[in-house]
């Protein structure tokens, strides 16, 4: 029975007649094979290398049931308009993955295979997470409805502001900027993603001044205010220590950079936040390293799905209109994946699989990066009510300074929401609506 030697992957791992199971994790890869490598072989190689395969036939294959555990490439289609590029669909049996570990899921699916010689490039476009697997994750600490109830804010997007200059302010001046923005009418202020604990502002001092800012603004406005305290740190222990301190100060929300911090750290923090009533704001620093290339890497919708499983209440999702990249339909596709329970397959929006999250709470998308008051009508229309709109320079860059900048954003937002509720067309009349709002 046993013959050593190298053999074609497609003999074992390309199974076009396979019927996918409801418990399978399905992946859609954009495969660019090297010249001369047939697409079936390339697709099968991806399935093999990300599941049970190795480059040769091994004796120990006889000790397990490959049919039960192997990944299968079950469908291949050419990409329209691209030469020698294919979408390969791969099904992975549920047993290949550890329960409740995004880290393990990614190690399996994208761990090794991206350096594969037979491929010129490889991109993971989408994943279908079966409910049997997603149920092993706790997901977002609270979710959209709970957050609205905690903050007592309904029927409009939330407003945030990243404190700039992002690096260099002392703790006290930082807190002062927070206070002015919150007092002016924003719901949240935010630590920038790279504000952790540097020599010019240590985390504990910053947190104390920011908490003071929030309480003072809360007392004066009668609205609940929050500052995203960035708990990202060099070790998981230090990260939790910062989150504990935020809780002791009574802060409503903390923040984490989930890609640089890592999924393991992020999931730990999400569990802590759920147990202690903290909201969790997620920044996606480093995402473009992974998702910006069209032919290689991973699409952000995969990172977004992973975050919903790992846990976070807000996540940055591009703006469609600001300084950072993001196409409208694709962005709305993964915004729905973050917020909704059930998302239909829709290739025009980049959604390769129907995804059913069942009862897993949703994540609020955050639009942030180079947006300002004149983008407000577009943002209100694109993102709808369940979103956070964040204006950093768009608040602090106001010629009359921070509080008026914040007030301008709040007035513009309320005007846009009111106009929308009256049935006006924001896309067409947006500028007028904002001009009229300036007058009061």
Curated annotation (Swiss-Prot):
Q: How is it modified after translation?
A: The disulfide bond which can form in the large chain dimeric partners within the hexadecamer appears to be associated with oxidative stress and protein turnover.
Question: Catalytic residues per the record?
Answer: 164 (proton acceptor), 283 (proton acceptor)
The GO molecular function terms of this record are: magnesium ion binding; monooxygenase activity; ribulose-bisphosphate carboxylase activity
Reactions accelerated catalytically: 2 (2R)-3-phosphoglycerate + 2 H(+) = D-ribulose 1,5-bisphosphate + CO2 + H2O; D-ribulose 1,5-bisphosphate + O2 = 2-phosphoglycolate + (2R)-3-phosphoglycerate + 2 H(+)
Q: What are its E.C. numbers? A: 4.1.1.39
Site-annotated residues for Transition state stabilizer = 323
UniProt keywords (A-Z) are: Calvin cycle, Carbon dioxide fixation, Chloroplast, Disulfide bond, Lyase, Magnesium, Metal-binding, Methylation, Monooxygenase, Oxidoreductase, Photorespiration, Photosynthesis, Plastid
Residues binding substrate are 112, 162, 166, 284, 316, 368
Enzyme type, top EC level: lyase
Q: Which cofactor does it need?
A: Mg(2+)
Which superkingdom, per the lineage? Eukaryota
Q: Quick one: which residues bind Mg(2+)?
A: 190, 192-193
Free-text remark on how the cofactor is bound: Binds 1 Mg(2+) ion per subunit.
Subunit-structure text: Heterohexadecamer of 8 large chains and 8 small chains; disulfide-linked. The disulfide link is formed within the large subunit homodimers.
Q: What PANTHER family does the record point to?
A: RIBULOSE BISPHOSPHATE CARBOXYLASE, RIBULOSE BISPHOSPHATE CARBOXYLASE LARGE CHAIN
Cited function: RuBisCO catalyzes two reactions: the carboxylation of D-ribulose 1,5-bisphosphate, the primary event in carbon dioxide fixation, as well as the oxidative fragmentation of the pentose substrate in the photorespiration process. Both reactions occur simultaneously and in competition at the same active site.
Concerning its family, UniProt says: Belongs to the RuBisCO large chain family. Type I subfamily.
What is this protein identified as?
Ribulose bisphosphate carboxylase large chain
Name its species. Answer: Bambusa multiplex
């Amino acid at each position: 029975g046993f013959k050593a030697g190298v053999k074609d992957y497609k003999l074992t791992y390309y199974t076009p007649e396979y019927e996918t199971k409801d418990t399978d994790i399905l992946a859609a890869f954009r495969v660019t094979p090297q010249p001369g490598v047939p697409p079936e072989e390339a697709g099968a190689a991806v399935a093999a290398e990300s599941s049970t395969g190795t480059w040769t036939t091994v004796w120990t294959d006889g000790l397990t049931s490959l049919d039960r555990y192997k990944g299968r490439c079950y469908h291949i289609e050419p990409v329209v308009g691209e030469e020698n590029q294919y979408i390969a669909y791969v099904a992975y049996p549920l047993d290949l993955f550890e329960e409740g570990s995004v880290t393990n899921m990614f190690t399996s699916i994208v761990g090794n295979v991206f350096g594969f010689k037979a491929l010129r490039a490889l991109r993971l476009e989408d994943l279908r997470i079966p409910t049997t697997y997603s149920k092993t994750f706790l997901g977002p600490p609270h979710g959209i409805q709970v957050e609205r109830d905690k903050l007592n804010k309904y029927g409009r997007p939330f407003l945030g502001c990243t404190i700039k200059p992002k690096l260099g302010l002392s703790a006290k001046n930082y807190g002062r900027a927070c206070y002015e923005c919150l007092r002016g009418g924003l719901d949240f202020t935010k630590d920038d993603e790279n504000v952790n604990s540097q020599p010019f502002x240590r985390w504990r001092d910053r947190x104390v001044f920011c908490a003071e800012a929030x309480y003072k603004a809360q007392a004066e406005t009668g609205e609940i205010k929050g500052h995203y305290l960035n708990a990202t740190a060099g070790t998981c222990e230090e990260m939790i220590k910062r989150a504990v301190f935020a809780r002791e100060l009574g802060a409503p929300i903390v923040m984490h950079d989930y890609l640089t911090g890592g999924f393991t750290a992020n999931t730990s923090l999400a569990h802590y936040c759920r147990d202690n009533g903290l909201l969790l704001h997620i920044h996606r620093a480093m995402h473009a390293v992974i998702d910006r290339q069209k032919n290689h890497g991973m699409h952000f919708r995969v990172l977004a799905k992973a975050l919903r499983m790992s846990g976070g209440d807000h996540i940055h999702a591009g703006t469609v209109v600001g300084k950072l990249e993001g196409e409208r339909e694709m962005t709305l596709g993964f915004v729905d994946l973050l917020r909704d329970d059930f998302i239909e397959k829709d290739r025009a929006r980049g959604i390769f699989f129907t995804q059913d999250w069942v009862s897993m709470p949703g994540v609020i998308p955050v639009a942030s990066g180079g947006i300002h008051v004149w983008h407000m009508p577009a943002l209100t229309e694109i993102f709808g009510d369940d979103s956070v709109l964040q204006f950093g320079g768009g608040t602090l860059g106001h010629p009359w300074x921070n509080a008026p900048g914040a007030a301008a954003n709040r007035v513009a937002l309320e005007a846009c929401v009111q106009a929308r509720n009256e049935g006006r067309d924001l896309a067409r009349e947006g500028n007028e609506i904002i001009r009229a709002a300036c007058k009061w």
